[in-house]
Structures are given as structure tokens and as C-alpha cells.
């Protein structure tokens, strides 16, 4: 696919083959000190940003952002990155993005923040391709070439980032996998895990479940046994009608009726008044009770998996779209935080700024300070 990646792949596959014949790749038994609790995503900077380059991208996240997050009480950040920002179509590095990533990690170190480097979107896999009727774009799970490209990207990321302490930086080698079969994802996990462990036996690896890191598919997730430097990740935006109310990219974007939380979200009157075109998607919200007990129920498989493997559990994305009624948003957020604290689940909100965030980069001011105050009422690390 990409000339440079293809050359690297030939060398890498040869080395892996020889290694596999003579040694067994094993993670270190030593557990590092990558402890996390309260964080946020630095989204739409090195990922999902097709416009900002040069000075605009450089100025988007600066030192004062890391200082602010530290002073507010956050202890880590998740940094989504995209292949198109770090490599051109021939597989050549694009230096500016690499410099910005290391700048971010250096600032994290300066301001006592741990970091997860999240490979968010790659050319062979985009988590939303199915919803955008571009299913053919996802070749990762059917192409050995694409899988080797993914490993090659992580070889290069590892070369650049391995100098950062295992206690401070973790790798999330893919975001929101969407494989037709759960075993396709499990097999890719094993392959990438083996490749990374041969280079970095103690680095914390964040691994999520198939189908958008959904809580429903955690029970099918298989992670390498005996590796304690792994974090299990899931994402949670339920109920979507509440968290994404009015979001133009969702099936229920045209719903303008009232919503309620906790309880049944949509009344019979509001359902009857809704457009016929959305009633099929809307109907479940007229009977299902949404409350803190529903959140606990949804989390049970993720909690069980973390106990089974004896590893940390992490909700990597959760949040409420900016136009949603703030009182409803705060009620849901409070319930989420309560469950996180009950089961010692680390979290990163989606996100710091942008349309789910609490900070306005253009105005350089809070756009939702009460949300931040609520987030900081939850449990933090005892010794950050």
C-alpha cells in the first residue's frame, strides 16, 4: 500500500519469523506504575483535524493547556493521533506532527500528567466508515498488508517514544475497532501485542473491545494472559438520545421533543409528535428506564473482565454534546462518576475542547466550568 511501509514490512516479517522460531515473546512480570483516574481527550488536534496545519495546529494546544489541566486536578490525558497527520501516502514521516506529539508528552511530564497515545484513525480503518456507507474503506481485518502497516507504524512510534518512562506514557494501538467477527480483532490484538512486547516488554498497552469499544462486546475480548501492564478500555455514550441530542450526524438528529433523565427519556406525547421517519429508532426510548442502575448493569461485563485479567479498567470516551440541556447533562455525568468511583474505573471525558468539551480555545475561557467542578468531585489519585 505504501512504499516505505512495504519495505519495512519485508524486514520486519523476516525478523519476526526468525524470532518466532527461536524464542517465545513474553511480557515482563514486573508491573509498572502507570496509574490513572481522571483525564480528558485532547481531541481534534492531531486527529480528526483536516484543516489545521502549520501555526494553527501548533497553537491549538500549548503549554498553558497542560498547566491548566494539572491545576484543575486531572492526572492524565488521552492524545488521539491519525495516520494521515504522521505519515504521507508513501509512508514517509511528516515531522511537524511528531514534534507536536513529543512536545505534548514533554509538557505532560512537566505538569505531572500521564498520557495515553491513541492511534485513532488509520488509512485502512476508520471507526465510522460503516455509518458513512463506506464499509469498503476498512481493509484492516482482511488484509495482511494493512495489518503489517499497523505494526510498522507502531515500530516507528515506539522508536520515537520508548525513551518516555513506562510509568508515564501508555500506547493504545487502535481506537474503536470494527471487525465483522470478534475473533478477527482478538487475533490482531495478539499479533500487535507480540510485536510491541518484543520491543517494549513493560509498556502499558490500552486494549478495547470490538465494535466501537462497546461495553456489549467486552465479553468477547481476549487479551494475552499474564501481562499485567495492560488496561482494558471501553467507551460509553448511552443513552445516545441524551448525550447526542441534536447532533447532526446521528439518526435522531431531527428529534426536537423533550427528553428526561433519569427515567424514561421520551413521553408518549413527544413520541407521537415526532417525525414518522425516526419513530423506529426513537421507540425504545419510550419504554427503557435510564438511570444509575442501568449504567451499573451496562458496565458489569467490563468490570468482570478487568477482574478476570487483574488489570485496570478505563472508560476512554464518554461525554455530552454541548447543546444538550445542562441540567440533564450534569445529572447523567454525576451518575457516571458515581459508578466510576464505585468500581475504581479510570476515565477520560470526550473532550477538552470542541463540541463535547468544557474549554473554549478561541475565547481562551471555560465554556462549562460547572461541568469541570462536577468532574473534580470524583475520586482522584491519592498520590499524583
Predicted regions and their residues:
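Hydrophobic beta-strand scaffold residues
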Residues: 115-117, 313, 347
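C-terminal motif of bacterial Sec signal peptides marking the signal peptidase cleavage site
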Residues: 18-20
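Bacterial N-terminal signal peptides that target proteins for export
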Residues: 1-9
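Bacterial Sec signal peptide processing site at the extreme N-terminus
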Residues: 22-32
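Aromatic-rich peripheral "rim/lid" segments of glycoside hydrolase catalytic domains that contact
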Residues: 324-384
